[in-house]
């Protein structure tokens, strides 16, 4: 080909029939417009496996023993293109798994290793994840071999677990069941900063290190948890201890688990900073095409092995960094440490004096020894009084340390998987753990029709029946599979006292429903859901539509002893647009809050629309307010909300902040009132398109059927047993 013919001419060759990366987007033109993309980010069209593929079914054909054997072999099969430190990939695989699971935060349940999200931006290019692209590429032959029987999400976590086993740790167990996503997660808020490792003051409300912005758990943009050099890169182990306590607590870890995970993660492997970090090439997401998804090209020396640069700190923590032992605590507690600089210029702690034989050897030449090092987080385990007590106990009792760490590692790597019912595989521990939110199995042998009849005969109103069932189920969040109606925790602390659950109304309703459950043999959890179903069926009948709401019995009733009150505090709703309620005013708009809750519940924009329209006319608003109840037939499941929202004989006038009057255009008479959220369904072009469908004369039955389908989806969101 003539070289001159390939030179750019200055004109774009694309005919602009479709938009890929050029041109302005709607967001560019209208940056404040409501963005519904987070509700459709994992559409089945992006999944190459197809909508009929079941990962749980595929897992049944996985040869787990062969897979584990292959992973054990991989650990010591050093590759020339990316050689293993000391001939063992254990440290690299553990860091990969740690950084996958460690992005989890309890506040909204997002992050974590449950979706294989480390394969995509931004996580694949975070500064804290330098070289993990190599770890995943080392795993590719195994992923290729086992294909769709093994997700990337499971493989990444299993590789870290097998790495520990290969170095001598008796692990607590492992569960398969994590399903891959196929594009970046748009719903996860990682922070507002526009540059990596920006000063942490941008995400703190004050000098108090506990004021870290919710829902974040990492102290800086691009880090998994704390800065290894100290707060904002300034060494101060006591201040770093404060950061650790906050970040690990937001990962659901207590002090003992924090010490165990930090020490256990640093018992093996090393940091890498033998070079100039400023010379590293682009991260994977912005690297040139010939890099094929790899990043951070290192031009120093061989660019690998002893010349590897990741965090910028350099050195191993222990004398024997490829074996599980108590060397970390012996090294940390039995030496005095001073602050020094790594070859890359990073601040790290090194021993004032140390015996030559206690130094770790070079990763390539065992005749060369170097000083061990400690991060600021490691030093925090020595200088913080509470961390120090725990460290000293671990140093005296290797067996106890190993047990605590193994359990903490299992918790770290499984916390975002949800209840034990989602676990698959031969190594699932038999023990039920409190953080798994255990729910005893429920009965299915009772008379469902009898329960429904008793509910229908009760004094409870349609709004009470529906609102109680909704409040029980709405806590579900698909981010970490927690919450939901199963277990009937709405009758226990802390949920029974949550303001959003209207405790007085709830207590009154529960007295009736609990008596019905006791008399019929049904669980309270099933009875609550059936109560909502009965309310909907009665409301549909009042609207002239006969419908039976699908129901699957089998929910159990959990107990106070099986409920970690503090752990459930993060599930407390502080807003619920479906019931037109805000606990207080927030800086974020009500419609954005609504989208966040909807996404966590796993609902689409269409499902959100039909549910809001139905719940409004059923009179389920918090406190019985009439905002958005655009009907003269409250309690009947009609499409009146949409009919009147889209009727041009009305005009909408603000009369207070975020509150509006709906007036007759001719007479000026106030017909109804509405919140800002109610009106969004008529003002946003996408939501209005859905609203118009349900407002049509031929959509009365469609509206009821779609409402019922969305309702059942919410009620069954946590019924993982039904997936079997």
UniProtKB/Swiss-Prot annotation:
GO BP annotations, alphabetical order: cellular response to hydrogen peroxide; hydrogen peroxide catabolic process
GO cellular component, one term: cytosol
Cross-link (Tryptophyl-tyrosyl-methioninium (Tyr-Met) (with W-98)): 225-251
Site, as annotated: Transition state stabilizer: 95
Location of the region described as Disordered in the Swiss-Prot/TrEMBL record: 1-26
Similarity annotation: Belongs to the peroxidase family. Peroxidase/catalase subfamily.
Keyword terms: Heme, Hydrogen peroxide, Iron, Metal-binding, Oxidoreductase, Peroxidase
Protein name per UniProt: Catalase-peroxidase
SUPFAM superfamilies with a match to the protein in the record: Heme-dependent peroxidases (SSF48113)
Cofactor-binding details, from the entry: Binds 1 heme b (iron(II)-protoporphyrin IX) group per dimer.
Function summary: Bifunctional enzyme with both catalase and broad-spectrum peroxidase activity.
Record gene name: katG
Superkingdom of source: Bacteria
Enzyme Commission code: 1.11.1.21
HAMAP family linked: Catal_peroxid (MF_01961)
One Pfam short name: peroxidase
Transmembrane segment boundaries: none
């Amino acid at each position: 080909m003539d070289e001159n013919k390939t030179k750019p001419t200055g004109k774009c060759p694309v005919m602009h029939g479709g938009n890929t990366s050029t041109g302005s987007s709607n967001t560019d033109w209208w940056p404040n417009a409501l963005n519904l993309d987070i509700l459709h980010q994992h559409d089945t069209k992006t999944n190459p496996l197809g909508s009929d593929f079941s990962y749980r079914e595929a897992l049944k054909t996985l040869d787990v023993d062969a897979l584990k054997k292959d992973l054990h072999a991989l650990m010591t099969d050093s590759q020339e293109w990316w050689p293993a430190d000391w001939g063992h990939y254990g440290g690299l695989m553990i860091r990969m798994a740690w950084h996958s699971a460690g992005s989890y935060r309890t506040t909204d349940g997002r992050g974590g290793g449950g979706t294989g999200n480390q394969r995509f931006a931004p996580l694949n290019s975070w500064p804290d994840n330098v070289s993990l692209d190599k770890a995943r590429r080392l795993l590719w032959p195994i992923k290729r071999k086992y294909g769709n029987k093994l997700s990337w999400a499971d493989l990444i976590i299993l590789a870290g677990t097998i790495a520990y086993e290969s170095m001598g740790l008796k692990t607590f167990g492992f569960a398969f069941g994590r399903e891959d996503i196929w594009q970046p997660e748009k719903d996860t808020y990682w922070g507002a900063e526009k540059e990596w490792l920006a000063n942490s003051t941008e995400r703190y409300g004050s000098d108090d290190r506990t004021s870290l912005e919710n829902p974040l758990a990492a102290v800086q943009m691009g880090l998994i948890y704390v800065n290894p050099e100290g707060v904002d890169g300034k060494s101060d182990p006591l201040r770093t201890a404060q950061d650790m306590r906050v970040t690990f607590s937001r990962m659901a870890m207590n002090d003992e688990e924090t010490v165990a995970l930090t020490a256990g993660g640093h018992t093996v492997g090393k940091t890498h900073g033998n070079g100039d970090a400023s010379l590293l090439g682009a991260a994977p997401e912005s690297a040139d095409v010939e890099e094929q998804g790899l990043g951070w090209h290192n031009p120093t020396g061989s660019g690998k092995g002893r010349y590897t640069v990741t965090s910028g700190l350099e050195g191993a923590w222990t004398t024997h960094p490829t074996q599980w032992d108590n060397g970390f605590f012996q090294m940390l507690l039995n030496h005095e440490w001073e602050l020094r600089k790594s070859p890359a210029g990073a601040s790290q702690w090194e021993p004032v004096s140390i015996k030559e034989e206690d130094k770790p050897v070079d990763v390539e030449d065992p005749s060369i020894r170097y000083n061990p090092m400690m991060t600021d987080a490691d030093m925090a385990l020595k200088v913080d009084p509470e961390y120090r007590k725990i460290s000293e106990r671990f140093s005296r009792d290797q067996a106890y340390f190993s047990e605590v760490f193994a359990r903490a590692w299992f918790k770290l790597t499984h916390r975002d998987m949800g209840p034990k019912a989602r676990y698959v595989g031969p190594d699932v521990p038999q023990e039920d753990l409190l953080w798994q939110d255990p729910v005893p199995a429920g009965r299915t042998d009772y008379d469902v029709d009898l329960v429904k009849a008793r509910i229908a005969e009760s004094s409870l109103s349609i709004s009470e029946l529906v609102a109680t069932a909704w409040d029980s189920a709405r806590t579900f969040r698909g981010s970490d599979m927690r919450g939901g109606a199963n277990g009937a925790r709405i009758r226990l602390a802390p949920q029974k006292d949550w303001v959003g659950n209207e405790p007085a109304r709830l207590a009154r309703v529960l007295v009736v429903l609990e008596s019905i459950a006791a008399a019929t043999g049904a669980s309270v959890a099933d009875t609550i859901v059936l109560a909502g179903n009965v309310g909907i069926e009665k409301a549909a009948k009042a609207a002239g539509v006969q419908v039976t709401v699908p129901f699957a019995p089998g929910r159990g009733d959990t107990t106070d002893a099986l409920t970690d009150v503090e752990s459930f505090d993060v599930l407390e709703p502080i807003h619920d647009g479906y019931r037109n309620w805000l606990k207080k005013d927030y800086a974020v708009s009500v419609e954005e809050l609504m989208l966040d809750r909807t996404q966590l519940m796993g609902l689409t924009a269409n499902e959100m629309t039909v549910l809001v329209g139905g719940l409004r006319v059923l009179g389920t608003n918090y406190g019985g307010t009439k905002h958005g109840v655009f009907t003269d037939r409250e309690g009947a499941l009609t499409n009146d909300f949409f009919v009147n929202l889209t009727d041009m004989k009305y005009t909408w006038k603000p009369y207070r902040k975020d509150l509006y009057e709906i007036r007759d255009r001719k007479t000026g008479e106030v017909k109804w009132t509405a919140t800002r959220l109610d009106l969004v369904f008529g003002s946003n072009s996408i939501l209005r398109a859905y609203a118009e469908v349900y407002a049509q004369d031929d959509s009365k039955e469609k509206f009821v059927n779609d409402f019922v389908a969305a309702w059942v989806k919410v009620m069954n969101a946590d019924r993982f047993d039904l997936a079997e």
